[in-house]
Amino acid sequence: MVSKKQNIYLINWLNFSLVVIILMVIIGAITRLTQSGLSISDWRPVMGIFPPLNESQWNEAFDYYKEFPEFKKLNFNMTLNDYKTIYFWEYLHRILGRFIGLLFIFPFVYFLSRKFLNSSLIKSLLLLFSLGVLQGFMGWYMVKSGLVNNPYISHFRLAAHLSIAFIIIAYVYWIKMSIMYPDKNKKSLQKYNHSINFILFLFFIQIVYGAFTAGLKIGNYWNTFPLMEGQFIPYGLWDLEPAYSNLLNNKKMIQFIHRAIGIFLLISIYLFSFKLKDLSLDFNLKGRNLVTAISCQVFLGIVTLISKAPLVLAASHQFLAVIILLLLMNTKHSLKYKR
């Protein structure tokens, strides 16, 4: 039997882990927005913890970077000082990833040895660890896609990398909440669960299309709202063959879908908040928080689009998406477990 004090240690560990993972996601956004993601062209899980420490090592790293298409085709005028700037963000992103790995492994082993963990929690944490390992490999797999003749990362791999990050955040939060509130609700709230599951499904589709928009740099085009090229539904959405490829590669279609899902999410959450009013004051507050967050996100998305995705706005847009996910997971957990 795990004591309350032991649970507090577990909750604090998961809370801290959650903060660091969210920080990792924001730094990942900055790394992408500053075009820093291909600055480190190899993957050394152990020796990669050491950055260049003197001028000779910096020149060696820069010379290695010069061998790849990003320098040859895009950054041929880059100086060593410019390179140090983009190296910093990618290095910080990678070193934080390693820190998260250690932040999981050492406390997990300690808690396991002290019998803080029941069998169900052990399984959940091992699954979480597997997701973390998968995310590490996906990050490198994504970088590799930009080290070839076309010096741009695959928007499909970026979408996978970002989606896994959001899944990890949701899962860490769910595990933490399940430790805090382990008793299931007896009251049937199935109709509310269906609604929140639908919203979560829409949310993750939106994350994918947000990654497509970012990976293909579509934020630089059609910088008006609500119209695109003077129309609500612009021409050219189905120009590619076969038809399904428009959903994956047509820049105009991808931005249109990202806009449309954003509005659809706003409406869905607004309607869902009315349902929650019937339950309790607590659920009413959760509904209002969701409406406020999604309203701010839609507004921020529009401003980011109109201003052609400047770094601060675009990174804030990604951060607010994390907040919305946490609010959704909190509401979903509250529908299933007693408070």
Language-model-derived ranges and their functions:
Residues 12-49, 202-213:
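N-terminal signal-anchor transmembrane alpha helix
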Residues 31-40, 137-158, 213-223, 298-322:
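Interfacial helix-loop-helix junctions of multi-pass membrane proteins
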Residues 64-102, 245-265:
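Individual transmembrane alpha-helix segments
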Residues 112-126, 273-290:
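Membrane-interface helix-loop-helix junctions at transmembrane boundaries of multi-pass membrane enzymes
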